[in-house]
């Protein structure tokens, strides 16, 4: 099974110079948690997640309209797979890169779609439940292992929660 059977199409994108305010609005309007950042040729150069926006706002102490993806995407590893890659290759790449979403590219490197762990879980669950042939079912073991790894918290970053008292 190839990843192009699972990937989301018609992905909303932004440019490196877009404001994080605009990126957050795209996420809200299209009910998604990540927006790929593309260059003028529609080739992925990074990705902005809802967590990136929250952390940028908190750490930079600036309004979102004054922040752009280019301020942090170049320090992140670009995680992509090709649309003809197998589900297993995509899972392996997500696991090795420690990501929950991976951009999918065409043979020419342009953005074709995106796949999230939620997409994979939904697809594998549906294919296993609806399959009449064992050859069409998906082995959930690698999916579950990948979910465990990318969902694990980084203990060195965890801090006890403290109550915030209003002024």
Model regions and ranges:
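Generic alpha-helical hydrophobic packing signal
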Residues: 13-14, 34, 69, 101, ...
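Structural motif
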Residues: 34-35, 45, 78, 101-103, ...
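The conserved cystathionine-beta-synthase
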Residues: 13-31, 38, 80-98, 104-107
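Short hydrophobic beta-strand segments in globular cytosolic domains
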Residues: 44-45, 54, 105, 111-112, ...
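Tandem CBS (Bateman) regulatory domains
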Residues: 1-10, 49-99, 116-167
